[in-house]
Curated annotation (Swiss-Prot):
E.C. no: 3.1.-.-
Localization (cell): Cell membrane
Occurrences of domain HD (ranges): 337-430
Membrane-related topology note: Single-pass membrane protein
Transmembrane segments: 1-21
Protein name: Ribonuclease Y
Keyword terms, alphabetized: Cell membrane, Endonuclease, Hydrolase, Membrane, Nuclease, RNA-binding, Transmembrane, Transmembrane helix
Main location (coarse class): membrane
BP GO terms, sorted: mRNA catabolic process
Superkingdom of the source species: Bacteria
GO molecular function: RNA binding; RNA endonuclease activity
HAMAP family on file: RNase_Y
Keyword Zinc (UniProt): no
C-alpha cells in the first residue's frame, strides 16, 4: 500500500515537473517566435522606408523633369509668339511705309494740279486781256476808217475783220510753234529726270548665274563614300538628278555641274543631307532626292510669297505665287528672271507714282510681265503667249493681261501702265552688265538637246550633262526593249546631227532599268 502511494506520488511529481518544463519550453518558444516576428517586422518596415524614400526621390526627379519640360514648352511658345509679334510689327511698318509713299504721291499730284490750275488761271487772264485789247484795236480802226474813207459801216466792218483775222491766225501759229517747242523740251527733260530717278531708287545688284554649285565635305574620306562601290552611288545621283558630280583634287569639296538651276539645287540639297546622315547607298540616295524635290517645291512657294509681300501686292492666286518663285531658277541672257521682274516692278511703280497712276497695279503688272518664262521650257509657245494664258487662267485684270501681251510690241498697249512696264522692261534689260548673250545661247543649246531626246516614244526623261557633251536618256522598260534601246540611241544621234549645231562630239547614252520588288510579310 505504501509502495503504491509512493509510486503514485512519484508519478504526480513527474507530471507536475513535466508540466512545468513544458510550460517553460513553450514560453521560451513563444519568446523566440516573438523575437523573429519582431525582427521580420523591423526588416519589412526598413525595406518599406527605403522603397518609400526611393519612390519619393523618383517622384521628385519626375516632377523636376516635368517642370523642365513644361518650362521649355512655355519658353518655346513664348519665343514663337514673340517672333510672330515681331513679324506682325514688321508687316505693319512696311504697310505704314507704303501708306506714307501713297500720301507723298497724293501730295505730289495735288501740287501738280494746283500748278496746272494756277497756269490755267494765268492763261485765262492773258486771253481775256488780249480780247479786250483786240476789241479796242478794232474799235479804233473802225472809227479811223469811217472818218478817212467813204465806206459804209458794213464794208468797214468786213475790212477790219479780215485784217484782224489774218493777224490772229499769224499770232496763233507763232504761239502754237513756241508752245510745241517748249513742251518737247519740257517732256524730254522730265522723262530723263523720271527715268534717272527710277533707276537710282530701284538700283539692284545683279550677278550672272553660274552653272556649278560647290558642296563642302567634312573630310576627303567622304569622297570615296560618295563615289561608292564601282561608282554606283555617283551614277545613281547623276541619273536621278541629271547633274554632273565632279570629284577632283579640290580638298573637302565636290562640284555639281548642270545648266538647270532647279535640278542642281535639288542635287545639292540631297547630297548635303546624305553627307550629314552618313548612310550613302542607291536606295538612300533615291529617298533623299525625292525628299529634296518636295522641299524644293515648298522653297519655291516661299520665295514667291516673300516677293509679293515685299512689293506690297495682295490677293494673288497661290499657284501664280508658286510660278513667280520658279522665276528665281530661270535666266534670260544670263540675267535672273525673278530679279529682273522685281526690278521692272519697282521701276514701274516709281514711274506710275510720278504720273499719278495706280502704283500697286503697276508693280503687279511689272512683276508678272515675264511670268511665261517660268513654264516656256515645259510648254510650247512664246513666253508672252504663255504669260497671257496664265494670267487669264488665274483671273488677273485686263490691264495686267494687256501689259504682258504688249510689252514686246506684239499688240497695242491699252493703258498707261502697259507703256510704263514696257519702258521699265527696256531699262532693266538694256543697262550695262544686265545680260550676257553667250550664257543664254549655251543654256538654249542644252535645253534643245534635252527636247530632241524627249520627243521620242518611250522616253521617260533626259538630261544633258558634261557641259552638253553627253545626253543621258532614261526610257520606260515596258515600252522599250534592249534591242530597241540601241536603235533609239542611233535615232537620237541622227536627229541631233540634223537639228543642232555644236562643237566636238555628243555622246548619247540610253539607260533602260528594270526593277522587281517584293515585300516579305
Amino acid at each position: 500500500m505504501i509502495i503504491a502511494i509512493t509510486i503514485l506520488a512519484i508519478a504526480i511529481a513527474t507530471l507536475v515537473i513535466g508540466f512545468a518544463l513544458g510550460v517553460a519550453y513553450r514560453k521560451r518558444s513563444y519568446e523566440q517566435a516573438l523575437d523573429v516576428a519582431t525582427q521580420t517586422a523591423t526588416g519589412i518596415i526598413e525595406t518599406a522606408k527605403k522603397e518609400a524614400a526611393a519612390s519619393k526621390k523618383e517622384a521628385i526627379i519626375e516632377a523636376k523633369e516635368e517642370n523642365h519640360r513644361y518650362r521649355s514648352e512655355i519658353e518655346s511658345e513664348l519665343k514663337e509668339r514673340r517672333s510672330e509679334i515681331q513679324r506682325q510689327e514688321n508687316r505693319l511698318l512696311q504697310r505704314e511705309e507704303i501708306l506714307d509713299r501713297k500720301d507723298t504721291a497724293l501730295d505730289k499730284r495735288e501740287d501738280v494740279l494746283e500748278k496746272k490750275e494756277a497756269q490755267l488761271d494765268s492763261d485765262q487772264k492773258v486771253v481775256t486781256k488780249q480780247k479786250e485789247q483786240a476789241s479796242l484795236l478794232v474799235k479804233e480802226q473802225q472809227d479811223k476808217l469811217e472818218e478817212i474813207a467813204a465806206l459804209t459801216r458794213p464794208e468797214a466792218k468786213e475790212l477790219i475783220l479780215n485784217e484782224t483775222k489774218e493777224e490772229l491766225i499769224h499770232e496763233r501759229a507763232v504761239m502754237i510753234k513756241e508752245s510745241e517747242e517748249e513742251t518737247k523740251a519740257t517732256v524730254d527733260r522730265k522723262a530723263k529726270s523720271l527715268i534717272a530717278q527710277a533707276i537710282q531708287r530701284s538700283a539692284a545688284d545683279m550677278v550672272s548665274e553660274t552653272t556649278v554649285s560647290v558642296v563642302n565635305l567634312p573630310n576627303d574620306e567622304m569622297k570615296g563614300r560618295i563615289i561608292g562601290r564601282e561608282g554606283r552611288n555617283i551614277r545613281t545621283l547623276e541619273t536621278l538628278t541629271g547633274i554632273d558630280l565632279i570629284i577632283d583634287d579640290t580638298p573637302e569639296a565636290v562640284v555639281l555641274s548642270g545648266f538647270d538651276p532647279v535640278r542642281r539645287e535639288i542635287a545639292k540639297m540631297a547630297l548635303e543631307r546624305l553627307i550629314q546622315d552618313g548612310r550613302i547607298h542607291p536606295a538612300r540616295i533615291e529617298e533623299m532626292v525625292d525628299k529634296a524635290t518636295k522641299d524644293m517645291d515648298a522653297k519655291i512657294r516661299e520665295i514667291g510669297e516673300e516677293v509679293i509681300f515685299d512689293l506690297g501686292i495682295h490677293s494673288m492666286h497661290p499657284d501664280l505665287i508658286k510660278t513667280i518663285g520658279r522665276l528665281n531658277y530661270r535666266t534670260s541672257y544670263g540675267q535672273n528672271v525673278l530679279n529682273h521682274s522685281i526690278e521692272v516692278a519697282k521701276i514701274s511703280g516709281i514711274l506710275a507714282a510720278e504720273l499719278g497712276e495706280d502704283v500697286i497695279l503697276a508693280k503687279r503688272a511689272g512683276l508678272l510681265h515675264d511670268i511665261g518664262k517660268a513654264v516656256d521650257h515645259e510648254i510650247e509657245g512664246s513666253h508672252v503667249e504663255l504669260g497671257v494664258e496664265l494670267t487669264k487662267k488665274y483671273n488677273e485684270s485686263e490691264t495686267v493681261v494687256n501689259t504682258i501681251a504688249s510689252h514686246h510690241g506684239d499688240t497695242e498697249p491699252k493703258s498707261v501702265i502697259a507703256v510704263l512696264v514696257a519702258a521699265a522692261d527696256a531699262i532693266s534689260a538694256a543697262r550695262p552688265g544686265a545680260r550676257s548673250e553667250s550664257l543664254e545661247n549655251y543654256i538654249h543649246r542644252l535645253e534643245k538637246l534635252e527636247d530632241i531626246s524627249n520627243e521620242f516614244k518611250g522616253v521617260q526623261k533626259s538630261y544633258a550633262i558634261q557641259a552638253g557633251r553627253e545626253v543621258r536618256v532614261i526610257v520606260q522598260p515596258n515600252e522599250v526593249s534592249d534591242l530597241e534601246a540601241t536603235v533609239l540611241a542611233r535615232d537620237i544621234r541622227m536627229k541631233i546631227e540634223d537639228e543642232l549645231e555644236y562643237p566636238g562630239h555628243i555622246k548619247v547614252t540610253v539607260i533602260r532599268e528594270t526593277r522587281a520588288v517584293e515585300y516579305a510579310k
